[in-house]
Design a protein with these regions (language model features):
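PLP-dependent class I/II
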Residues: 2-4, 12-14, 19-22, 26-32, ...
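Substrate/cofactor-recognition hotspot
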Residues: 8
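A glycine-/small-polar-enriched, mobile loop at the entrance of the PLP active site in fold-type I
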Residues: 37-40, 55-73
């Protein structure tokens, strides 16, 4: 008899684990792996943020805080939402958690009943599907082939009486696609016709954008304000992935329920990390411009290099630090060892085993025959990785 709960059968390890395990095995054998799979900035947390954490430690701010976050951090979040997104919230509409992932998990736990449908545009961040499944919801995956974005027509075709949530992730992981003001306005028109559908916006890459301005949907259509729940955090913008601070902003009764769940699980987020996050949101943002310029230069370099690889096709992302690369041109080809590349998983395994480059298969994000490549790495590593990928493509197309 298994001691595991039946609900564990509803979730599965990410396909990325196999790549990670294989990369670690090769590293253990002394091989140098070019890892282009990172989901976090490669820069350090800015000094003024670290200094705020050190000061909090020295001042003895090491006790429990309010379950839903310190007053100072909630005020900083409220200021940020008004400053950056032109949205006004009260403290009882904010809950701080141990990362954006936790507050999203709690939001779904607090609201999804068995059979409730959640519309998830694909490609999607890997955790959305399993979170919905864990609470006996029904993920309604919408494959978005037009610039990797949900269209009003696609959305309208998927809404039913059972639809509870629409998930919008912009800029998107894994594609870097970002919705424009007009695109969000058009999606809003559909949502205004279906008052039972709530919207969660995963805005975690908000400050890593390039050629367009960022908008969140409640900013574009104020009539949706009470139905929109913004999930965000300090991980990506401020290079604070390990600090584990995220937050949700939305209707107070749902936010209260999220806080209640948190009170019976993790309790408050780390007190020192909250002090650091407060400084991140309130402090100097000058470094963001320089950091974004660095990412943009890397993006442009990678797009040009990889578009020269036979069999690959790369579109230009508008945000985040990923390329979502079509590998359809190498499918059906053979490696030097005679193995046929049937899909994106085969291709990523080939890149790692034969060319020592670690990337993530698109199937992990709900869209086959693509690979996700992170450019959150040094220029030297990116050049090594690109050259290795180009060589890999040339080899399998001539074998």
């Amino acid at each position: 008899m298994s001691h595991l709960a039946e609900r564990m059968s509803l979730i599965k390890p990410s396909p990325t684990i196999a790549i990670t395990d294989a990369a670690n095995k090769l590293k253990g054998e002394g091989k140098k792996i070019c890892v282009l799979a990172a989901g976090e900035p490669d820069c350090d947390t800015p000094d003024h943020i670290k200094d705020a954490a050190i000061q909090a430690i020295n001042e003895g701010k090491t006790k429990y805080t309010a379950v839903d976050g310190t007053r100072e951090l909630k005020e900083a979040i409220i200021k940020k939402l008004e400053r950056d997104n032109e949205l006004k919230y009260e403290p009882n509409q904010i809950c701080v958690g141990s990362g954006a992932k936790q507050v999203l998990f709690n939001l779904f736990m607090a609201t999804i009943n068995p059979g409730d449908e959640v519309i998830i545009p694909a490609p999607y961040w890997v955790s959305y599907i399993d979170m919905v499944n864990l609470f006996s919801g029904v993920p309604i995956v919408v494959e978005c082939k037009q610039n990797f974005k949900l269209t009003p027509e696609l959305l309208k075709s998927k809404i039913t009486k059972k639809t509870k949530w629409l998930v919008i992730n912009s800029p998107n992981n894994p594609t870097g696609a970002m919705y424009t003001h007009n695109e969000l306005r058009d999606i809003s028109k559909v949502l205004l016709e279906h008052s039972h559908v709530n919207i969660v916006t995963d805005d975690i890459y908000e400050h890593i954008i390039y050629d367009e301005k960022f908008f969140t949907i409640a900013q574009v259509e104020p009539k949706l304000y009470d139905r929109v729940f913004i999930v965000n955090g300090v991980s990506k913008a401020y290079a604070m992935t390990g600090w584990r601070i995220g937050y949700v902003a939305g209707k107070s009764d749902i936010v209260k329920a999220i806080s209640t769940l948190q009170s019976q699980s993790t309790s408050n987020p780390n007190s020192i990390a909250q002090a650091a996050a407060t400084e991140a949101l309130n402090g100097d943002h000058g470094f963001l411009k320089e950091r974004t310029e660095t990412f943009k230069n890397r993006r442009d370099f990678m797009v040009e290099k990889l578009n020269s690889a036979p069999g690959l096709s790369v579109s230009v992302p508008q945000g985040a630090f990923y390329l979502f690369v079509s590998c359809e041109g190498v499918l059906g080809k053979k490696t030097k060892n005679g193995k046929v590349i049937n899909n994106d998983l085969d291709f990523t395994e080939y890149l790692l085993a034969d060319h020592l480059v670690a990337v993530v298969p698109g199937v992990a994000f709900g869209m086959e025959n693509f690979i996700r490549i992170s450019y959150a790495a040094s220029h030297e590593q990116l050049e090594i990785g690109c050259n290795s990928i180009i060589k890999a493509c040339q080899e399998c197309l001539t074998s």
